[in-house]
């Protein structure tokens, strides 16, 4: 039997908990890491380059820390 997957859910604002709830419903056996970026909210007030400059390194750090099998950006 294989180990349950680890799923990282990155919430960029509103709606991430709804996404997480649906994923948990589909995969109740998985391990979860949920991270909300409240400090940069709302993302709509930032330009594309600014968002990329923030999110790419942050997701990289989260992947290194949690070693997920799947990353969901909500």
Specify the residue positions occupied by each region the protein language model found:
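Non-catalytic structural scaffold of enzyme domains
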Residues: 1-74
């Amino acid at each position: 039997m294989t180990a349950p997957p680890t799923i990282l859910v990155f919430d960029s604002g509103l709606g991430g908990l709804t996404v997480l709830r649906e994923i948990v419903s589909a995969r109740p056996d998985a391990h979860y890491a949920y991270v909300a970026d409240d400090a940069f909210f709302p993302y709509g007030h930032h330009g594309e380059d600014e968002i990329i400059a923030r999110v790419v390194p942050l997701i990289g750090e989260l992947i290194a820390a949690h070693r997920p099998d799947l990353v969901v950006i909500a």
